[in-house]
């Protein structure tokens, strides 16, 4: 858990590292090229970021998302975007699809869960958390294939379908 401790003690450095990683990824995408972002140096400062990367509505990103959903690589994220999660539609009645990458699953959802479990075990060492099964509740479990390389559905279906082995071994229901 050294990375958690480091982030707690140096939050600005931790956030800057995440920010620069995202900026670097943006330079490898069609969206980044469209915005004229060739190098992380182009938006390494806050004022450059605000100027070059405007706040947009879903409808502005929808054509980019649809390109990725059809299987095009390097659109909004480097490489493949294999999954698209249906939003709950809180801003309008329209169905919205949110890109979910392998990196988002592993570095966000799964890493976050692992970090929470590690913190819990460190604070409650006699909890016997790993003595039995873990109940995992989710929404709809089916995914619909959209193209040869992309699927869409509920975020919980995407997460549960690709659980890491350390989690899958203890999951219930299976």
Label for each model-derived stretch:
Residues 1-86, 92-174:
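Nucleotide 5′-phosphate-binding alpha/beta core
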